[in-house]
Amino acid sequence: MSSLSADRKPPLDYGVQIRFIKDLDDAGGGFPDKSRLANGVGGVSNGTSSPSKYGVAVRVQGISGQPYVVLQDGEKGDSYGVQLKTQPQIQSAPPVVSQTSPYNTLLLGQREGARTPQGSYNPTDQPSSPDEDFGSPLRRPPGDGQAGTQGEAEPRTTERFTPSALAPKLDKKDNDAFNEAGLRKVKQNGIGSSLNGTGLNGSFPPPSSAQDEDQAPAIDTKSLAPINKLISRFGGGGGGSGDILNSEAQTRPRLDNRVRSQSADALNKPSEEASSTSPTINPYAPNTSATVPKLNSTKPSSTGSLGRDATSVAKVAAIPNFKPLAFNQSPKLFAPKEAPPAVPKKPVTPDLIKSQTTSIENGNGEDDQTKQAIYNILKEGSIEKEEAIKRKASLIHERFCGVKAPQISVTDSNMKTELEQAFGRNTQLQQQLDKSRRELQENQDQMVELRMDREGAESRLRQQEDQLAQLQEELRRTLENSPQSDSMQLDLLTVQAELSESQLLRQKLEDTLRQRERELTALKGALKDEVASHDKEMEALREQFSQDMDALRHSMETVSQSQLEIEEERQKVNASILAMEEELEGYKEQSEQWKKQFSSANQELLKAQQGKRELEEKLLAVVKQTDETDSNSVMKELQQCRDSLKKAQSELEKQKAETLKKQEELKSATRASEKRETELKAEIDRLINQLKKEKEELSKAIEKTQQPLVSDQTKDPESNLELQEANARLRERIARMTRLHSSVPDSSSSDALEEENRSLKTQLEESRRAASRLGVEKEELNRRLEEREREREALRRGKSDLEEQKRLLDRSLDKINKEMESMMGDSRQSVQVLQSQLEEFRDRSRRELQDAQRLSKDRLVELQRAQALLKTTQEEVSRVKKELLSCTEERDSTQLDKELLSSRLKNMETELQTDRSSQTDRSREIRLLEDKVKTLEIELDEEKSGAELLNERITRCREQVDQLRSELMQERSARHDLEMDKSALERQIKELKSRIADMGTQSRPSAGVTMLENKVQELEDRLRSEEREKNTIQAAQRRLDRKLKDVTATLDQERNQHAEQRDQLSLRVKALKRQLDESEGEVERLEGVRRKVLRELEEQRELQAALQAKVNAMDNELRKIQQSRRSTLGSTLSSDEEDNYSDTKSITSILTDSPLQTTSC
């Protein structure tokens, strides 16, 4: 391996990493011994190692989150668990590694009696001979986490690392560095007493009781469990152990809480420290009688892969005042001593407890320890009471004490193989299911397309029929009006031909649709038939299983095997309980997520309500502003706002109605699917009968075809014989004729003979033709026979293929049913979780109903207000109309004045006309707004009806939930009673079996044995009946689960619909805000137009006043002129002057009275 980089972060590790090391030179932890490299005397030669020694470094996920290195050595493969720890920054230096394995010392210490060493180690003493090579303090100890192999017989090595020379003196920081394998070197301060010669037979004296008592509270036994046993047992003993490892691997502490493992010898001698020239010292060397340390792994860190960028092995630091530890383990297992009761939760597994109970020197204290460990394991994550947990712990302890490890390993391997087979079958079945579903979906899509085509054809047919009716009516009219009837009849005939063609097309489409429907029904029927056959086979299998169980119970020799099976079932139950607890946690997390979603929805609702309030405040502010400016603009804006609000309400009502319709469609679809299923079953039965009939007809037809062939074959030789006879006769006749011809030379006789020859030749030709015909017919019959035989063989092959497919499907269905039965235990707890969820949904639905009722009340109040505002606006509109009429009258008067005075008045008239057109557009808009108000009122009524329908649906859902709950409670009580009866029966059976076993030991059988056997049979019958009742209860529970799932699905759909409605409302509110802004702009524009009109009116009034002043001035001038004329002229002209004066008066009166006339108009 390359040196580890310090820049990258340590990757997380969740599995097992195994590294096979060919030689300890590749992954050593210290300097080689010069004396060893020079010469070897004793056990091991120079440069080589014994082939019996080997080692494997395995990185395994620990029980409580700690990683381990499993070190193996020797022929028996003993293993030692060592904790691994990660380091955030790594600096690697390639160390020089020793050549011999350091593990035999520990093995011998274990085999000779688990003794603790005495004495201390002087770091200045170095081994001087190869006999002391194994006990060198520079060697790696077995518990330092650096695994290596020695020997040339290891075939799995993939890499070989060349050791590099280190400096003769290293600092303490160098001791913390990593080797090439990514493992940290071990630091050790003290090692045991002197050697005894070879370094392979060191003995450990027994420890004192005082040392054990002082040492107990300082020991952490979490990291010293035998990991190979855990892997072999928890890998196949059910799903419980793997779940524990994975769950605890996800909850590891951080890197900052690392605690280095402690050395045992460092406690006895705190003053001694390792020299700078020995970075890794072997505490297990036999030459110094080193103590075996127990690595303290209180706070594990997050681990990566062994030898990667971010992983290392825990450093064995020299800590003072640590006392030597003791071994109390059998040769195969390295187990810790009794842990103190102060540790509340210790990761002890049932396999570790079993290995501890098998040891010879364990007493009552170890039994208590195992019980306490089981209690701690069961207590983690459980909700049950302490008494129940204690009972379970005692039962598990009693069971595991009597079970043997080899039997469990065999059963575990069998279970593993069965599980793998079941998983493979399950995947195959799932693939088949997916294929069938895809085919069904494709058929349904084709059905939909055909239906669409059919509907299109029907629509075309209707159009053509309508055209035909129109043509017939036109024909009648034309017949009545025009004499050209022939052409019309021809047209009618063409139309009828087209209609017939369209009918034929329609029939074809209908036939194709029916064929597709038949195919679909056939597929569904086949599926249903397979399901029914699977159920029947399941019942037959259950009966066979019950018979086998009876035979096993009758045999007294298999009592011990049945006990072992019961214990295995208990283990499975415990594993299933752990899995159920994990599912409970998952359901709790889901409930928390739903609560978060509900809180977010409430927040969004509150935001929407705040936005509504802000809109209302804006509306009030707009109303106040409009009151200040003008009443007309205010009323228009209010109308627009109300219209937009009504539109939004109408849209909401439509959405609710659509949701109700969708729900009704779903119900109708489910009903239709049920009806289709019943129809499919009937069609399947009909098809089966048809197939049987067709098979019979085929067999009859084959027999009929064979009979004429046989008859033809019998006839053919007869016809050949007849032909041969006819040929023979003809030859005889020809011979006769030739004789006669030779005897009679007359011409008449020669003619007769020629005629006879001709007739005979024609007869020969006819006979040959008949023979050829018969041969052709024979060949045709043979061909037909061969074709029939081929068809028959094809039918047989298809039949065999179908039977094989049916068998495969039946097997797969059996497997699925078995898996479903195993999953029933999981569904029971899910029902409880669903009940709690149902209660939560019920509370939520009540709250949502209350909110909806409040919202409906608020909307009703708003509608009433809007109606009142509409009335006031209508009154204001009428007043505005009156004002508009007065304005138009004033404009007309001004127009007349302008026509009389100047062209400027004409321009003003054009502008007034444009104003009139805008007023007509406004009146049209007002009418449209009134129509919209009416439509909104209608939509409001529809929304009220939809709300009532929703309330009725919610009441129905509540009633269904109550019914389901009552049924669940009844089934639970029944199930509890059945379980109690079953446990009582099992106890009775055990007592009876124990009695039978006692009676079997006696020499003479008594009548009591037969009585006991009869009782056992009766109890077994009772157990069978109870199992049947339990199956019925499970079926009912499945139905209830389905109902609950349907209810939850409907509730989820309604919740989603409410969320969509809320989103749409928020969008509608935004649109209303935009409309408000637009209406405000229109109001401002209208106000500008009004001001402009008022200005123009004022200008016109000013002009009118100016004209009036001019007219008055002209009157005064006329009067003055008349007075001057009267003084100058005589009396003769007085009458003429008076007439002129009257004329001027009339002109002024016309000018002054013109506005009055216009107003009257």
Swiss-Prot record:
Q: Offer a single GO CC term for the protein.
A: bicellular tight junction
Tell me, what does this protein do in biology?
A: Probably plays a role in the formation and regulation of the tight junction (TJ) paracellular permeability barrier. Note=Localizes to the apical junction complex composed of tight and adherens junctions.
- The main place the protein resides is other
The superkingdom of the source organism is Eukaryota
Q: Coiled coil: present as a keyword of the record?
A: yes
Know the name of this protein? Cingulin
Instruction: List, alphabetically, the Pfam families matched.
Output: Myosin_tail_1
Q: How does it assemble?
A: Homodimer.
Q: Name one GO biological process term.
A: posterior lateral line development
Ranges annotated as spanning the membrane: none
Q: Where is this region: Head?
A: 1-403
Family indicated by similarity: Belongs to the cingulin family.
Where is the sequence biased in composition, kind Low complexity?
189-203, 742-751, 1124-1134
Swiss-Prot/TrEMBL keywords: Cell junction, Coiled coil, Tight junction
- Coiled-coil regions listed in the entry: 413-1128
Q: Where in the cell is it found?
A: Cell junction, Tight junction
**Species this protein is from:** Danio rerio
Point to the regions of Basic and acidic residues compositional bias. Answer: 755-773
Look up keyword Coiled coil and say if it applies. Answer: yes
Q: Where is this motif: ZIM?
A: 51-65
Q: Which stretches are tagged as biased composition: Polar residues?
A: 84-104, 117-129, 273-305, 1143-1161
Gene that encodes it: cgn
For the region Tail, what residue ranges are annotated?
1122-1161
Where are the stretches annotated Disordered? 29-53, 79-309, 649-678, 699-721, 739-773, 1123-1161
